[in-house]
Amino acid sequence: SNKKDYRKEIVDKHNALSRSVKPTASNM
């Protein structure tokens, strides 16, 4: 359960970064 929360946090941060840089987000 701890790992899931940790992973979700990373995904949230990654999503936030992707939102900041839309051009690079499409490459991923």
Swiss-Prot record:
Residues 1-15 have a biased composition (Basic and acidic residues). Residues 1-28 are annotated as: Disordered. One of its GO terms (molecular function) is toxin activity. The keyword Ion transport does not apply. Residues 17-28 have a biased composition (Polar residues). Contains 8 disulfide bonds. Keywords: Calcium channel impairing toxin, Disulfide bond, Ion channel impairing toxin, Neurotoxin, Secreted, Toxin. Belongs to the CRISP family. Blocks contraction of smooth muscle elicited by high potassium-induced depolarization, but does not block caffeine-stimulated contraction. May target voltage-gated calcium channels on smooth muscle. This is Cysteine-rich venom protein asurin-2. It comes from Austrelaps superbus (Lowland copperhead snake).
